[in-house]
Design a protein with these regions (language model features):
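A membrane-topology feature that recognizes alpha-helical transmembrane segments
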Residues: 1-211
Length: 211
């Protein structure tokens, strides 16, 4: 049986991988904000002792992995395989960044740096296969970081404080290496729109409580 010309067995394999990776994201969400080693024998023992499956993360990651396989597809071309692999690697890191930022309003430098380093490796690998694609990804990093850096600086001048943290600047610089300059502009616009909507909702709910 095939879905979008891909054998359903591949979806099952990717889905199971997503379940495992989703639970690993929970592990990272605990370790990274504390600036501790992700892999630690002592923590592993403690984690497994109090182990609780994070079903939302597990099934959410599994769904995203299968969606990536569906939309990116499978190809015998090396550059397409690299493209699929980089999104499978990026997904759990983005989920971890979102969860930590939502809870603590920070994005750990180690997480941003890891994304940047992995993005750089894929940029160089894809650039060797297609120089134009490599340049596009490099420009994506410059544009992504540049847009958020400008907004952060302008926000600081107008409001006297950062409009957003430099963790966001680093994050967008790293994401640019994965998506390229055109997509990172679209992602930036979507991010601003979502941030504006969330801010309006929070302000409205706060005002309602004070009335």
């Amino acid at each position: 049986m095939y879905i979008n010309n891909i054998n359903i067995i591949y979806y099952i394999i990717v889905g199971i991988l997503g379940l495992i990776v989703g639970q690993f994201v929970d592990w990272c969400n605990i370790r990274l904000p504390e600036y501790k080693k992700v892999f630690s024998k002592e923590f592993f023992t403690e984690y497994m002792k109090n182990f609780k499956p994070k079903y939302l993360l597990m099934f959410g990651t599994a769904f995203l992995y299968m969606a990536i396989l569906y939309f990116k597809g499978w190809s015998n071309e090396l550059i397409m395989q690299l493209n699929l692999l980089k999104y499978l690697i990026l997904t759990p890191m983005l989920l971890s960044a979102f969860a930590i930022d939502w809870k603590l309003q920070i994005i750990p430098n180690r997480l941003n740096l890891t994304m940047f380093e992995i993005g750089l490796v894929f940029m160089l690998a894809q650039g060797m296969l297609n120089i134009n694609q490599g340049i596009n990804l490099l420009l994506g990093s410059i544009v992504g970081a540049g847009i958020f850096l400008i907004i952060t600086c302008i926000g600081g001048l107008i409001a006297g404080k950062e409009a957003m943290g430099f963790g966001d600047v680093k994050l967008m610089g790293a994401l640019g290496l994965f998506f390229g300059w055109e997509r990172i502009i679209a992602i930036s616009l979507i991010a601003f729109l979502l941030a504006a909507i969330i801010s309006i909702i929070l302000l409205a709910s706060k005002k309602k409580k004070t009335d």
